[in-house]
Design a protein with these regions (language model features):
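Short, surface-exposed loop/turn motifs with a glycine/proline- and acidic-biased composition
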Residues: 600-629, 635-638
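A surface-exposed beta-strand-loop module
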Residues: 20, 85-146, 525-531, 544
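N-terminal, polar/Ser/Thr-rich
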Residues: 18-64, 149-151, 455-457, 461
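Beta-strand-rich binding/interaction modules
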Residues: 90-94, 471, 476-520, 526-538, ...
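Hydrophobic helix-coil surface modules that form long, contiguous segments used
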Residues: 65, 159-160, 172-320, 349
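Surface-exposed, proline-anchored Ser/Thr-rich loop/turn motifs
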Residues: 555-579, 588-594, 614, 632-638
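Glycine/proline-rich low-complexity spacer/linker segments in large multi-domain proteins
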Residues: 39-42, 118, 127-181, 543-566
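Hydrophobic alpha-helical and helix-loop surface patches within well-folded domains
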Residues: 2-5, 16-17, 214, 252-485, ...
Length: 638
C-alpha cells in the first residue's frame, strides 16, 4: 500500500538555518559555449551530404581516397572552411567539378576559395592521403589495434567529440546533420568493412581488393559516420518492432572465428529482444529502413555509430547502452556538448530498463545502486559548464554524464509516479525531435507539457546544481501518530536545499504502509497517522533517490524493544531502544525445544527464521532491561 501525502508541510519548524527561495535557471543557461570557428566560417553553409571513398587496411591507419561534401550556402561567401587534420596530405580539390586553386591547409583547417551566394549549392571533392591516427590514444579519430585475446588486427574510427577531422574533411558542428552519407571502403579481399546504412554492393575492383558500398539516407551527425575493417564474418538476423510483422535487420560484423561466434552468439541475440523492448516502450527503432548492427573492435567499450555500433564485447549492459543511443544520441542528438546528458544519461538509464524488463528487478536494482554509488563520489553538475565544454574528460565524466545522469532520469520517473506516463513522455519527446537535436531545456519542456508538473526546481537542483542530499530522520510514535523529524543537509554548498519527495516505509504490528512525503525546507516534522505499534521505518525503500539517509525510531510508550512483523513469514525485525551489546534472543517451540539462540550485535537486527515450521513460538529477550517473553507466530507465504 502507498499513501501520497503531497507536498504538505505538516508541522513547520521555525529554524534560522532553513532555506527558502526560488530556483533560478537563468543563471546557468546564460553560460553557453561558442565554437570560435562557428560564427566566422561554419555558420555560413549547411552540409547536406558526405560521400567518402577510401582505401583502408586493417593493419594501419593510412588512408587514400576522397571525400565529397555537398553544401547549401546560408549567406554570401568567398571561401569555405572544413576541418581536416594537417597530418593528411591534400592532393587536389574540385568545386562543382572544376579544379580549385589557392586553397590552404594548416592548423587542422582546410580553406577553399569558393564565391557563392545565399541558396547556392556547392559540391566539394577533396582528394587526400596520409595517416593521422598515429599515437593519438583513445580519442584518435582513427585507430588500428591488435586484439590480443582474439588475435585480430582491426582498423576503426571513433570521431566523438571532435575527431572526425582525423580521417575526412568535415564540418564538426552538432546542429548541422547531413541528410545522408555514402561510405565506400576498398579493402583486401580477405577483409570486410562495416559502416553506416545499407550495404548496397560489394564490388570487385581488381588487384585482390573489393569495395564495400554503404548507403545511409537518414540525417546523421558528423561524429556518427564510421568505418571498421577486419577479418570479419556477417552474422545477421531480424528483430521484431512494435507492429505486427514489422522487423529490422540486425547485421553483425564479428571476427571470422567459430570459437568467438559460439562464445558470443547468445549475447548478440539479446540485441533483438532489446530492439523489440525499446520499440514498444518508446518508438520503433529509428533507422528501421536500414539496419542495426555491430562491428567488433578492441576499443575498450563501445561507440554508437549510427546503424552500426563499434563494440569491444557483447556484455548485456554494453549492448543495451549502445543500442539505446540509436534513440538517444543518434536519432535525437544533444544540441551541444554541455547537454551530453541527452545522449549518455538516457543511454545509461536504458541499461537499467533492459535489466528490469529482460533480466530481473533485482539485477536492475543492483545496477542502480552502483550508479548511485559512483554519483555520490562526484561534486560537479550533470550539465557541463561552458568553461569545460572542450575538456573531453569532463564532457564524458563517467560519474556525472553517465551514472548521475541515469540516476536523475530514475528520479524523474519516480516524481511522475506513473510508468505509463513516463514512457508516453519519452514517446512524445522522441517523435517531436526525431532526426534532430535537443537540449535539456527542450526535454524539460516536453516533460512539463506531458505531465502538467513544474520541473524547474528539479533541474535547478539535480541537473545544473551539484551534490546530493543527506537525510537524518528521527521518528517517534505518540497516540496513533508517527512524528518524523526530517533534517536535510547538502553534500556541497552549491545546492543548499533539494526540494523533493521521498517515500517512507512504516512497519507496524498491523502491516506495512508506504507514505510519500515532500521536503520543502532543510528541517521539517511530519505527522503521520498509524495503526498498531511501529517497529521500523525505512527511507526510500525502493531506492529511487540519489540520497543518503540515517533513520532512528524512538520506541513508543517507553518500551525497550519492538518486534515485527508478527505473524511473520521467514524473517522478523528486532529493534531495541538502546542496544547495550550482548542482548540475547532465544526462541522455543511449544514442545519446549530451543530452536534458535543468538546474540544481537546490530540495531535493528533481522532474524532469519526460514528454518522454522509454521505455528506459534515463544521468544525470550534478555538484556539490561531484564528478561521478557513474546508469543510469535510463523505463517506460510500465500
Amino acid at each position: 500500500m502507498r499513501r501520497l501525502l503531497g507536498c504538505i508541510l505538516l508541522i513547520p519548524m521555525l529554524l534560522q538555518a532553513q532555506q527558502h527561495g526560488s530556483c533560478p535557471l537563468d543563471h546557468y543557461l546564460e553560460e553557453v559555449y561558442e565554437n570560435p570557428l562557428y560564427e566566422a566560417w561554419l555558420s555560413k553553409y549547411d552540409v547536406t551530404f558526405y560521400h567518402l571513398s577510401l582505401e583502408v587496411s586493417n593493419m594501419d591507419t593510412y588512408l587514400d581516397g576522397f571525400t565529397s561534401i555537398h553544401v547549401v550556402v546560408a549567406e554570401t561567401i568567398d571561401s569555405l572552411l572544413f576541418q581536416l587534420n594537417s597530418e593528411l596530405q591534400v592532393s587536389a580539390i574540385e568545386v562543382n567539378d572544376a579544379p580549385a586553386s589557392g586553397w590552404r591547409h594548416g592548423d587542422d583547417q582546410l580553406v577553399i576559395p569558393a564565391l557563392a551566394s545565399t541558396g547556392d549549392h556547392l559540391a566539394v571533392k577533396v582528394h587526400y592521403q596520409g595517416d593521422a591516427g598515429r599515437d593519438r590514444g583513445f580519442f584518435a579519430g582513427i585507430t588500428s589495434a591488435y586484439d590480443n585475446t582474439n588475435q585480430q588486427w582491426v582498423t576503426y574510427t571513433l570521431s566523438e567529440p571532435l575527431n572526425a577531422r582525423d580521417w575526412f574533411p568535415v564540418k564538426q558542428v552538432l546542429t548541422d546533420k547531413a541528410d545522408s552519407v555514402w561510405v565506400d571502403l576498398i579493402v583486401d579481399k580477405e577483409l570486410m568493412a562495416g559502416s553506416n546504412g545499407i550495404l548496397e554492393e560489394i564490388e570487385d575492383v581488381g588487384g585482390g581488393k573489393h569495395k564495400f558500398k554503404w548507403r545511409s539516407r537518414y540525417p546523421i551527425a558528423y561524429y556518427l559516420v564510421s568505418l571498421a575493417v577486419a577479418d570479419y564474418r556477417d552474422y545477421s538476423f531480424q528483430a521484431a518492432l512494435s507492429g505486427p510483422g514489422d522487423s529490422v535487420l540486425v547485421q553483425n560484423y564479428i571476427y571470422d572465428d567459430d570459437e568467438y561466434f559460439n562464445r558470443w552468439k547468445s549475447r548478440i541475440d539479446d540485441t533483438g529482444e532489446m530492439i523489440t523492448l525499446f520499440s514498444n516502450l518508446v518508438i520503433d527503432y529509428p533507422f528501421a529502413r536500414e539496419k542495426y548492427g555491430h562491428a567488433v573492435a578492441p576499443m575498450g567499450g563501445g561507440m554508437e555509430h549510427q546503424t552500426m555500433t563499434t563494440i569491444a564485447a557483447f556484455s548485456f549492459t554494453l549492448v543495451a547502452h549502445e543500442l539505446a543511443h540509436q534513440w538517444f544520441g543518434d536519432n535525437i542528438t544533444c544540441g551541444n556538448w554541455q547537454d551530453i546528458w541527452i545522449n549518455e544519461g538516457f543511454a545509461s538509464y536504458f541499461e537499467y530498463v533492459a535489466l528490469q524488463n529482460l533480466v530481473s528487478q533485482e539485477e536492475a536494482d543492483n545496477w542502480m545502486m552502483y550508479a548511485q554509488l559512483l554519483s555520490f563520489e562526484e561534486t560537479g553538475s550533470v550539465y557541463v559548464p561552458a568553461e569545460e565544454a572542450e575538456n573531453v574528460n569532463r564532457v564524458f565524466d563517467y560519474g556525472l554524464s553517465y551514472k548521475k545522469g541515469a540516476a536523475l532520469i530514475h528520479m524523474i520517473r519516480y516524481e511522475l509516479n506513473n510508468d505509463a506516463l513516463f514512457y508516453e513522455m519519452l514517446r512524445i519527446y522522441s517523435e517531436r525531435y526525431t532526426d534532430s537535436l535537443a537540449t535539456a531545456v527542450q526535454f524539460r519542456e516536453v516533460l512539463e507539457e506531458v505531465s502538467g508538473m513544474d520541473f524547474s526546481c528539479f533541474f535547478d537542483q539535480w541537473y545544473y546544481g551539484t551534490g546530493y542530499p543527506r537525510f537524518n530522520l528521527v521518528a517517534e510514535e505518540m497516540n496513533d501518530t508517527l512524528y518524523v523529524q526530517s533534517l536535510q543537509e547538502p553534500s556541497t554548498t552549491g545546492t543548499p536545499l533539494f526540494r523533493m519527495h521521498f517515500d517512507l516505509l512504516i512497519s507496524t504490528s498491523e502491516g506495512n504502509d508506504t507514505v510519500r512525503l515532500c521536503q520543502e525546507m532543510n528541517e521539517q516534522v511530519f505527522a503521520i497517522p498509524v495503526s498498531g505499534e511501529v517497529y521500523d521505518i525505512r527511507f526510500d525503500p525502493e531506492n529511487h533517490l540519489l540520497a543518503k539517509s540515517y533513520a532512528e525510531l524512538k520506541l513508543a510508550g517507553g518500551r525497550e524493544y519492538a518486534i515485527g512483523p508478527n505473524p511473520f513469514n521467514d524473517r522478523m525485525l528486532l529493534r531495541f531502544r538502546n542496544l547495550a551489546g550482548g542482548e540475547e534472543v532465544k526462541i522455543w517451540n511449544l514442545e519446549g525445544k530451543l530452536v534458535m539462540h543468538t546474540t544481537v550485535t546490530s540495531n535493528p537486527s533481522e532474524l532469519n527464521l526460514e528454518g522454522l515450521i509454521d505455528g506459534p513460538y515463544v521468544m525470550v529477550l534478555t538484556g539490561p532491561f531484564g528478561e521478557v517473553r513474546e508469543t510469535i507466530f510463523k505463517i506460510g507465504k500465500n
